[in-house]
Amino acid sequence: MDPQQIKAALGSGLLSFPVTPFDAENRFAAAPYQKHVEWLSGFDAPVLFAAGGTGEFFSLTPDEIPAIVKAAKESAGKTAIVSGCGYGTEIARGIARSVEAAGGDGILLLPHYLIDAPQEGLYAHVRAVCQATGMGVMVYNRDNAVLQADTLARLCDDCPNLVGFKDGTGDIGLVRQITAKMGDRLTYLGGMPTAELFAEAYLGASFTTYSSAVFNFVPALANKFYAALRAGDRATCESILNSFFYPFMELRSRRKGYAVAAVKAGVRLVGFDAGPVRAPLSDLTGEEEEILKALIDAHRE
């Protein structure tokens, strides 16, 4: 898939990022992963993000990532697969090349590791990764890797395969400046934790879609909310926010890392063998899983 094709796919509907299952020896479990990806691809997501943030990219080795991408491609049907990519520049360039060799359709460039960097350094990092691959690249603005509008404009001029921008800062002023400056040069994707909570605000800032974590275990509900959002059906959006998303947010906020662990628990609760989260994350307690189960059962469609 060429960069313009993945750009179009990214903007064509609701997106998600499958969890990465691990077996009893803490190894990537390909069979249950493929079963889950196949199920998700039946709910019309144009793109799934393999080995993304909710897929525990931060706990994967670079060698595991192409295997995960290959497994996803084999089971996703017509759904495009974009892979997580990140760490330091040279590691990220290597991951980008390995994802392309594994048949991936694009990469989502997550923040580099640990250290803060000036805009010139961020520019050099993103440019180097874009130059390492012919695939389309989406940058993820968050934490220690926040590109300002002028830096992003330079990258758009210098990197034809930079096709997407995902925001996890929540800084609507910055993202509105970026969408005003870049226009349709990029596809824009909301990337806040439990993105539905922020979807209306981002829609007003020209972000027409987002990646839904709960799509992992209640995809029909996620699609219902997204359809209501795009149709301007605020009554349905408010109803689903109050009955599902705010209670889920309350559970997710109990401990650091639950933005991933709660999603993985949800996948297990709907019948998939997702296994545990890897350290340094912790799984939900038994009591918390019961709370999540009741929430899911009340919203199955």
From Swiss-Prot:
Coiled-coil region list: none
Keyword Cell inner membrane: no
InterPro entries the record matches: Aldolase_TIM, DapA-like, Dehydro-deoxyglucarate_dehyd
UniProt-listed Pfam families: DHDPS
Catalytic activity entry: 5-dehydro-4-deoxy-D-glucarate + H(+) = 2,5-dioxopentanoate + CO2 + H2O
Gene Ontology MF terms in the entry: 4-hydroxy-tetrahydrodipicolinate synthase activity; 5-dehydro-4-deoxyglucarate dehydratase activity
CDD domains assigned: KDGDH
UniProtKB keywords: Lyase
Family classification: Belongs to the DapA family.
Protein name: Probable 5-dehydro-4-deoxyglucarate dehydratase
